[in-house]
């Protein structure tokens, strides 16, 4: 049944919130279990819609998947199927991450082109090019990525852009290829590091983890393992930005602040007091936020997933800010909804200029993707009156217990069935 959120603005948020495992990590870890026959256990899984969706994809490939609490127990068969059908894959983008493991383990794959968030073009060109360099034939046929190989052999691979998805798919095929693979301009995101950590626990030989140059020495086989998902830095930062916007005081636990240094620096520039420990941070804002300029970049830059929240923050900041989107070209669709809330914002190509106002005004708004939805809810927290946010299933795909956590922090928010 379709649902909406009703957000009443004006409340100051305060308290403590613990984040779960990272959405951008857990789905790839689940896919990686296909590389090893037997049962792997993944803990600290977030309570989000995409986890059971990925479980369905894996079941369709012959795996047995048990989900209980924050644990996923996945048993990969001795001969996985290699055809990921459209019905399961179409619902979310990360489903394409089964491509690399299937090519690595089965030497063939047929994966329907995925669905997911409407944030711009995200072609699979680099995924295909990397697999071809490993010796696979890889093409788009009838709406599917079709790949096959007699043997995979290590290669020197230069990525045009440090794509997270391409890095991960190439990596998961290369760990069982013959010889040595070097990925130049590899993605350095904490989620990629988390995947490498699990693969090495399974018996892979991956070096240069977290650096732009990754070296993989192929091994004949991998083995099941148990692994704990890292904390979700995007969810954690969302709570930190919510504190800054509402002039609140929120402690966020369960995440490594080292994964968010630039974001926390920007919050400090906006006037927040930021303190950190090894696995937590606290954001306290006592006055109206100051304007800040933000440019999204691959890690360790400012995450593109937090761009909508940055626009929401600057929409009520003192001064004029420029937000530059360097990763996804269509992510500024979110600005149209912010304008409905009274934001003074305009876009020009990859740039958005936002002139901060003392307060936004309530209006009905629609989510186009996970992060845009979270940004709209944050905007509703500082709007005058009741803001109705529609298509909130997007938010449920990436934020566990979103309404409950906000309510515990002092927000006035309600989930309503349409």
Swiss-Prot record:
Signal peptide feature range: none
Compartment list: Cytoplasm
Residues reported in the UniProt entry to bind UDP-N-acetyl-alpha-D-glucosamine: 93, 305, 327
Highest taxon of the lineage: Bacteria
Enzyme class: transferase
GO terms assigned for molecular function: UDP-N-acetylglucosamine 1-carboxyvinyltransferase activity
Protein name as catalogued: UDP-N-acetylglucosamine 1-carboxyvinyltransferase
CDD domains listed in its UniProt record: UdpNAET
GN (gene name): murA
SUPFAM superfamilies for the chain: EPT/RTPC-like (SSF55205)
Entry-linked HAMAP family: MurA (MF_00111)
Binding site for phosphoenolpyruvate: 23-24
Gene Ontology BP annotations: cell division; cell wall organization; peptidoglycan biosynthetic process; regulation of cell shape; UDP-N-acetylgalactosamine biosynthetic process
Pathway: Cell wall biogenesis; peptidoglycan biosynthesis
Similarity comment: family membership: Belongs to the EPSP synthase family. MurA subfamily.
Reactions accelerated catalytically: phosphoenolpyruvate + UDP-N-acetyl-alpha-D-glucosamine = UDP-N-acetyl-3-O-(1-carboxyvinyl)-alpha-D-glucosamine + phosphate
Cellular component, GO, one term: cytoplasm
EC nos: 2.5.1.7
Keywords assigned by UniProt, alphabetized: Cell cycle, Cell division, Cell shape, Cell wall biogenesis/degradation, Cytoplasm, Peptidoglycan synthesis, Transferase
